[in-house]
């Protein structure tokens, strides 16, 4: 498996040979930022197009098919239309909070991307508390949502923001405990070590029943954290027009829309990394020839294939189940998912303590 750290170290040494270390680090940070923005733009276009096609498939229709081959340029046209729209600020809104909220939401998505390993040696931050950093950074987004509801000075926006805040804060518990269940199995919170620990088998298979339960709970709770159906009540059109982004237009609305799909991909990426081996290829013990063939497939292809598989599962859930009421959403979390997650965490601890795992 190719190690991308060889390339990054070579670039770092080359820059150090022609300039001071401070300038070299500054240029590297700029390059990383440009790469992240480019990746974000590509992911947004692909995910929105994929959502429309998957939705059309489940509803027995074609989806976008007019602009470009198979409607492939429709998303780009929508982006250009959004860029040309006026950014309108309500007269009675708190201008500072109103304008700050979209940036808070998008910054939270940027930060969570930092510790996800796309390939061996291809992660921005690789440190021993990567799981804690991920959970902490992802919780910043709820602050932006609450600021959007309050700063808009609109009762529908405020109700949507309060619903979203209660929902996200509640489901973060299940997400955290599902991830910690797998941390107990591996014994580390560093994402690169978690992936390398799955060289001889993915955790969803090595962890037995507790790993499968944690994966299912993570998918449900992760979907709820992204405010996607059937947990999209904070922006229910029939009740709250558009929820906390009712008063937003132009690229301010675009930031919220973009953050939803980026958070969807982040949830899928974390699931692929922790449960499905990340960039690690599929290996079956005893089949050396098969394992050698799998090693020829680049790691980033494995990573994105697994991530988009999880994205498809989450889209399948959204377009299959009806929207839940707010009391049903919170009952599902506090009466079912949290107790099951706690028991599952203890069960995994017992499995590790007594060696009941592969």
Swiss-Prot record:
GO CC terms: plasma membrane
E.C. designation(s): 7.1.1.-
Topology with respect to the bilayer: Multi-pass membrane protein
Alphabetical UniProt keywords: Cell inner membrane, Cell membrane, Membrane, NAD, Quinone, Translocase, Transmembrane, Transmembrane helix, Ubiquinone
BP-aspect Gene Ontology terms: aerobic respiration
GO molecular function annotation: oxidoreductase activity, acting on NAD(P)H, quinone or similar compound as acceptor; quinone binding
Transmembrane segments: 30-50, 96-116, 129-149, 168-188, 201-221, 265-285, 297-317, 336-356
Subcellular location: Cell inner membrane
Catalytic reaction list: a quinone + NADH + 5 H(+)(in) = a quinol + NAD(+) + 4 H(+)(out)
Source domain of life: Bacteria
InterPro entries xref list: NADH_UbQ_OxRdtase_su1/FPO, NADH_UbQ_OxRdtase_su1_CS
Pfam name, any one: NADHdh
Top enzyme class: translocase
Family: Belongs to the complex I subunit 1 family.
Function text: NDH-1 shuttles electrons from NADH, via FMN and iron-sulfur (Fe-S) centers, to quinones in the respiratory chain. The immediate electron acceptor for the enzyme in this species is believed to be ubiquinone. Couples the redox reaction to proton translocation (for every two electrons transferred, four hydrogen ions are translocated across the cytoplasmic membrane), and thus conserves the redox energy in a proton gradient. This subunit may bind ubiquinone.
UniProt subunit comment: NDH-1 is composed of 14 different subunits. Subunits NuoA, H, J, K, L, M, N constitute the membrane sector of the complex.
Full protein name: NADH-quinone oxidoreductase subunit H
Organism classification: Bacteria, Pseudomonadati, Bacteroidota, Bacteroidia, Bacteroidales
């Amino acid at each position: 498996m190719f190690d991308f750290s060889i390339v990054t170290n070579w670039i770092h040494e080359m820059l150090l040979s022609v300039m001071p270390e401070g300038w070299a680090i500054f240029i590297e940070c700029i390059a990383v930022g440009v790469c992240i923005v480019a990746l974000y733009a590509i992911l947004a276009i692909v995910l929105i197009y994929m959502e429309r096609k998957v939705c059309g498939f489940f509803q027995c229709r074609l989806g976008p098919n007019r602009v470009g081959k198979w409607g492939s340029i429709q998303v780009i046209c929508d982006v250009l239309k959004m860029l040309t729209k006026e950014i309108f600020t309500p007269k009675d809104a708190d201008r500072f909070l109103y304008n700050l909220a979209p940036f808070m939401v998008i910054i939270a998505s940027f930060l969570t991307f930092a510790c996800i390993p796309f390939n061996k040696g291809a992660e921005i931050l690789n440190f021993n508390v990567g799981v804690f950093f991920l959970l902490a950074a992802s919780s910043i987004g709820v602050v932006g949502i609450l600021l959007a509801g309050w700063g808009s000075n609109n009762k529908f926006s405020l109700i949507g923001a309060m619903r979203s805040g209660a929902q996200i804060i509640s489901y973060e518990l299940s997400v955290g405990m599902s991830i910690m269940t797998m941390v107990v199995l591996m014994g580390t919170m560093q994402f690169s070590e978690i992936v390398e620990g799955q060289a001889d088998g993915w955790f969803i298979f090595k962890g037995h029943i507790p790993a499968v339960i944690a994966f299912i709970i993570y998918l449900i709770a992760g979907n709820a954290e992204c405010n996607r159906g059937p947990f999209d009540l904070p922006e229910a059109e029939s009740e709250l027009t558009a929820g906390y982004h009712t008063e937003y237009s132009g690229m301010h609305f675009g930031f919220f829309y973009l953050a939803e799909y980026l958070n969807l991909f982040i949830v899928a990426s974390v699931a692929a990394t922790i449960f499905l081996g990340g960039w690690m290829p599929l290996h079956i013990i005893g089949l050396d020839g098969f394992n050698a063939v799998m090693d020829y497939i680049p790691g980033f292809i494995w990573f994105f294939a697994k991530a988009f598989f999880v994205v498809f599962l989450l889209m399948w859930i959204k377009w299959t189940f009806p929207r839940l009421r707010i009391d049903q959403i919170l009952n599902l979390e506090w009466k079912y998912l949290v107790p099951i997650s706690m028991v599952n965490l203890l069960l995994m601890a017992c499995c590790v303590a007594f060696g009941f795992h592969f």
